């Protein structure tokens, strides 16, 4: 589909705006994936707060100029599907990772977080805010239980020594 200059400028501006406000970005090759599966991926992305766009490589390179995702410029080769996480840094990577398990033709090319190329697997395993709070509370709970056990053991040792 031929795009005129105004359409190209609009696409670059739209992707640049998405990149400017994003927490992380993931680039993938969706060649060979069924249309129904891609529609399902787009639906899941909307629910997860991930902006998805299939972009021409030249337009993608121009769109990320001046953003934290300029490091992805060399990755824009071949069919490019780019996802920007807006609510949680690992959302797009987790979404793409789960989708790649179901669709063997789907290939994750690269991921970026805070202006640095990152392993998509690592980015996908980042805990959500709620998970991080839960882990912190577990650590705090375990620490107090450990103190109680050590205190009781110390009292027991004192009684045995006496």
Swiss-Prot record:
Record-level GO BP terms: translation
UniProt-recorded Gene Ontology molecular function terms: large ribosomal subunit rRNA binding; structural constituent of ribosome
Matching SUPFAM superfamilies: Ribosomal protein L10-like
Entry keyword annotation includes Translocase: no
Job description of the protein: Forms part of the ribosomal stalk, playing a central role in the interaction of the ribosome with GTP-bound translation factors.
Quaternary state and interactors: Part of the ribosomal stalk of the 50S ribosomal subunit. The N-terminus interacts with L11 and the large rRNA to form the base of the stalk. The C-terminus forms an elongated spine to which L12 dimers bind in a sequential fashion forming a multimeric L10(L12)X complex.
Protein name: Large ribosomal subunit protein uL10
Species of provenance: Vibrio cholerae serotype O1 (strain ATCC 39315 / El Tor Inaba N16961)
